[in-house]
Every structure is written in C-alpha cells, then in structure tokens.
Amino acid sequence: MKLWRLTRAPFVALDGKGAELFGARYAPPGHPVVSLASEAGLAVLVALRYQPPDLAGIPDDFVLGWTESDVTPERVPDPDEATIRACVGEWLESRRSLLAAIRSRVLPEADVIYLNPRHPDATRVPPLTTRPFSFAECLHTPPMLASFKGMT
C-alpha cells in the first residue's frame, strides 16, 4: 500500500520525533509515531487544517511524500475520540504491529495511518520519495471560477 505524508522538508524522516515531543492528534507526547494517510488528498486536507486561513506566512519548503508497505494496518476502533486515544496509546506501547489505521474525521472514506517507529519492522519501510508542494499553487483561484459564479 502507498502511504502519503505532507510535511516540511526538514521533517521527512519517518522517526516520529515531532509527535514524541509534542504529541499527535491521537497520541500523547512521549511516544514517537508517524502520521501518514491512505490517500494523497487526505494528506493535503489534514495539513491544510493546520495552516492559517489566509495561507499567509506558510513556509515554502513543504513536500508531498510517499512510501510503500505490504503490511496490513491494524484497524483502530473509533466510536469516540477517547477510545481512539486509548487504543492508539496501548498499540504504541505494545509494539504489536507496524501500522494502525484510523478512519479519518476529515474524509471518512480514507484512513489516517500511524506508523510505529519503535516496531522492529520500521527499519524496512523505505524513506519518503518527495516532490515540492505549494499550498498557493494547489489552492489558487481557477481561471474559470468567474464563469461558474452565475450558475447557482
């Protein structure tokens, strides 16, 4: 399976250091974990939620990256946020699987995929292949927008 990540270039390593220091949405600080997405579009949507609404001051060193793994992710139950957090914390501690899949709240048809860098198989995951990514280019106003405004 292809796994996607939109991040700044200095943070492409799949080591989970950022989450270890600051936590992740479903993981407390102190646990390294790498947040990935099952779809490139989900990686963009999730990253966009953390940017200023007017996109002012966004660094210009973002990259869209992907890696691949043949491992089937363990499905995390998701009846509520507390359950997800508890399950992810236990999953990270146990190191029983490399990947965990959490249904995305942003796009429920896709999954946030957590990679546990402390799992023994983490060293087998190839580093990200990346390309430059620009929010400004991605979200520019399309030239035909004016044509559609009168169609509502």
Across the structure, where does each feature detected by a protein language model lie?
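Active-site and NAD+-binding cores of ADP-ribose-processing enzymes
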Residues: 2-15, 27-28, 56-152
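Extended catalytic/binding region for NAD+/ADP-ribose chemistry, centered on the ART fold
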Residues: 27-50, 113-118
